Each structure stands twice: as C-alpha cells, then as structure tokens.
C-alpha cells in the first residue's frame, strides 16, 4: 500500500505487528504457562491443571525442568509482546524526486536510538540491487547501493516475495529513481 505521486513515493514498512508474530506470542505464552503450572502443581502436590494427576510428575527432576521451561518461555513470550507493542522494524521509505532526497525511517527498541532515520541524496544512489539466494530457505532482498555507504536493505529478509513481485518492485523503483538494476 504505497503512496505515489509524480515527484514523491512513500513506501510504508510493516514491522513486528504481523499475524505470525501474534500467533507465536500467544502459542508461546499459553504453552509456557502450562509448563509452569504443571511444575508448580508437582511442587505443591495439588492439581492446578485437571488434565492429569500431579502425582504422576515428580518434582525432582521433571517438575523443576518443566518450571524452568515455563519461566524461560514466559520471558521469550514477553519479549515478543514487547516487540509487537513497540512495533519494532516499522517505518517508511520516502523518495522525493523534486527535492532530490531519500529518507528511510524505522522504529527500533526503546532507548537512545529508538528512531533510525537515514537521509541521503538521490544523486548518490548508484543502483537498485536484487540479491537472490536459492535453496531450502530461499530469500530475495531488495537493496539500494549508496555511494560511500554501501548497500541499504529496503525489504525484510522474512518477506516472501515471488520473483515476479520482487522484479516488479525493483523495476518500478529503478525507473522512478532513474538508476540501473543489478541482480546478484
């Protein structure tokens, strides 16, 4: 859902608020809560979960291990929920032909460098580059080569674009910026 006119192209970037992240955070939270409840019920000797009797799980070593896995899972789940609530990785790419400026903005983790803002001139863009890695975990990433700064990724590695979609996006951007396309 990009916003485009004759002189300006704004491409919004989706961050951590993806359906898969929500699903993993919920599954991890519920699973680790279950592990922690089973470990606690084996320690107390009472049934906190009525699915199976707590006498079948001895506190040492099974109950301790399940409690540890439950606590570790809750920490990982809370990390996922924090990245979702802070929307880490979201932002926008703004290409302004009229002013000759490209702005790349991303939200990061809270702290001194929460806002990542890159700004450079369009005349410093050497090319738009597509990097393709085939195999079991095939990935296609769109980069922008900047003179003196190297390659800046414009797409995330977990975005599964088809080859046609990636080529289309690269061709449109290269045409808009009037730079060549490179494929690696």
UniProtKB/Swiss-Prot annotation:
Membrane topology label: Multi-pass membrane protein
Record-level GO BP terms: photosynthesis
Keyword presence, Cell membrane: no
Record-annotated membrane-spanning stretches: 22-42, 57-77
Keyword tags: Chloroplast, Membrane, Photosynthesis, Plastid, Thylakoid, Transmembrane, Transmembrane helix
Cell compartments where the protein resides: Plastid, Chloroplast thylakoid membrane
Pfam family for this entry, one: Ycf4
The keyword Membrane appears for this protein: yes
Taxonomy, superkingdom: Eukaryota
Chief localization: plastid
GO CC term, one of those recorded: photosystem I
Function: Seems to be required for the assembly of the photosystem I complex.
Similarity comment: family membership: Belongs to the Ycf4 family.
Protein name stated in the entry: Photosystem I assembly protein Ycf4
Species of the source: Helianthus annuus (Common sunflower)
